[in-house]
Amino acid sequence: MSAARSKRPRTTNDTPPIWEGVPGSLHGSAPSTQNHEVQESSDDSTPHTLLHTEGLKKVYDGRAVVNGVDIEVKAGEIVGLLGPNGAGKTTTFYMIVGLVRPNGGKVMFDGNDATEQPMFKRARLGMGYLPQEESIFRRLTVKENILAVMETQSYTKREREEQCQQLMEKFGIDHVADNLALTLSGGEKRRLTIARSLVTEPKLLMLDEPFSGVDPIAVSEIQDIIRMLRRAGLAILITDHNVRETLNIVDRAYLIYEGQVRRHGTKDFLVNDPESRRLYLGEDFTM
């Protein structure tokens, strides 16, 4: 989705690319993110609701695997979708992305009814999607991977080179710029995938199993990236079976069980909530 063709004219007066607003980098200048907590804003302004669903429903073989799911994601926050296998969280996620068509309900994105829109049109609205499966070009270099996506945008050659270098530096992959993507580690591939996704300047980034198949150090790096993107104002929706890694980074999460949202709240609420433990986390769950 991130490479959907969407030519957008640029001028020297345009707003800078979203990644220019990402504070720090993976070269060590990012602020510490240990013991991350949701901070209450002292500003009276209410964050813009970028995504919300209304009564999403999906029926397979006469059974409602998703039955009336309402969620919302505001600009500048990280939201998780949690639940056991078969609960409906992945189907909900795919209905939002556009991979699965709902039998009922709505997907509203940035004031637009996206329910019937194909993925490429959702991408043009600003909905970015990073699939669990590897989506990079394995036989292109890191630099070529990013430049290939930039070809779909209205950059000059000089702008492409400058922005590509900036992205690689921001995500700590400039040292492997000329390496084939197939030679990268799991963490480097994830960073390249996220860097490519920002070329189209999404408003919402949907991450499908971002912590799957990477080692603990890479998980920490990916969490740092996600927090950096949050501080830049992106909205982020995550679904992942790695519960601790997900809860450690979200501002809040929805627990989906038997096709419905059964619990919703911050990490601290869900971890200490008896019903969340009974349905999904388990009585002995600790962070």
Regions found by a protein language model. Name each.
Residues 180-184, 188:
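Conserved ABC ATPase signature
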Residues 105-113, 125, 163:
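Conserved ABC transporter NBD signature motif
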Residues 147, 158-176, 224-227:
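Conserved ABC ATPase "signature" region
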Residues 82-84:
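The feature captures the beta-strand-to-loop junction immediately N-terminal to the Walker
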Residues 97:
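Helix-to-loop junction immediately C-terminal to a conserved catalytic motif
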Residues 201:
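Conserved catalytic motifs of ABC-family nucleotide-binding domains
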Residues 205-209:
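Catalytic Walker B motif of ABC-type/P-loop ATPase nucleotide-binding domains
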